[in-house]
Amino acid sequence: MPGIAYLGPEGTFTEAALRALQAHGLIPSTAPDAAGADEVTPIAADSTSAALAAVRSGDADFACVPIENSIDGSVIPTLDSLADGAALQIYAELTLDVSFTIAVRPGTAAADVRTVAAYPVAAAQVRRWLAAHLPEAEVVPANSNAAAAQDVAAGRADAGVSTALATQRYGLEALAADVVDEPNARTRFVLVGRPGPPPKCTGADRTSVVLQLDNVPGALVSAMTELAVRDIDLTRIESRPTRTGLGTYKFFLDFVGHIEDPPVAEALRALHRRCADVRYLGSWPTGDVVGAAPPPMDESASWLEGLREGRP
């Protein structure tokens, strides 16, 4: 059975996402000729970077990590870990609705709370609630939502922004439940493994790449044009520093379609020719079409294929 590293400890939203990926049959099997994994071995990691490092080292077959949320945007440690080091590939994604439990030790009242442990991504999603209900409390960083509950249980914080599961597991009580500033808060998680053949095209797919461009005028516009002229819907673009010098960046691109779609394949070839470096992060199913699907092979492609086969 595959070993899946995830942002631990037990009780995080990432563990819940891992279980949901398994329930939906989205975790590939490591056994030959098997369609999907019926059983998995969860491996708790201290950080998203550590979870991805476990895949690179072979200590885990896959990692389940958060990549984006609707409140605070991209999860930067995940992006940086995907862009640097040995190549990795995304095989599946899943989106969870997110709300938090404010966990406290039994008998603790709101007036007793002076410190609140919170994973930074979670803190951003409950900032207004904390300001309204615990205005005097200091927010201290935790390594994960479940680690925030552990900090409370160990007495390192008076309260923690955590999950209902972690609150129960660590013998705590809920000072407040279903806490979130935005009722439509959602987090997208991805399943990451070592490079291999991508999942089959479903018609509702996402492709992701990381581009490094030459430092010449119009380089980014030229790269984007390769998608635009093929009617490929770009759904996300984000820059991150290369860490090699000021003013140098890598660009993360998500777009609708699969490497098996002819327009996407053509665009990837063109980006490879045009850019200093292209890191392919994968093509995988999204479940629902997000954006406009790439156009089917048009009449001109059929005409060209006929010429190749001697049918003018």
UniProtKB/Swiss-Prot annotation:
The cross-references to InterPro entries, in alphabetical order and at most eight, read: ACT-like_dom_sf, ACT_dom, Chor_mutase/pphenate_deHydtase, Preph_deHydtase, Preph_deHydtase_CS
Q: What is its EC number?
A: 4.2.1.51
Output a single Gene Ontology CC term carried by this record. Answer: cytoplasm
| Record pathway | Amino-acid biosynthesis; L-phenylalanine biosynthesis; phenylpyruvate from prephenate: step 1/1
Keywords on record: Amino-acid biosynthesis, Aromatic amino acid biosynthesis, Lyase, Phenylalanine biosynthesis
Domain named ACT: residues: 208-285
Q: Where is the signal peptide?
A: none
Annotated region Disordered: the residues are 291-312
Site note Essential for activity applies to 187
Q: Where is the Prephenate dehydratase domain?
A: 3-194
Q: Amino-acid biosynthesis among the record's keywords?
A: yes
Gene Ontology MF terms in the entry: prephenate dehydratase activity; protein homodimerization activity
Q: Example GO biological process term?
A: L-phenylalanine biosynthetic process
Keyword Amino-acid biosynthesis listed: yes
Assembly and interaction partners: Homodimer.
Under which name does UniProt file this protein? Prephenate dehydratase
What organism is this sequence from?
Answer: Mycolicibacterium vanbaalenii (strain DSM 7251 / JCM 13017 / BCRC 16820 / KCTC 9966 / NRRL B-24157 / PYR-1) (Mycobacterium vanbaalenii)
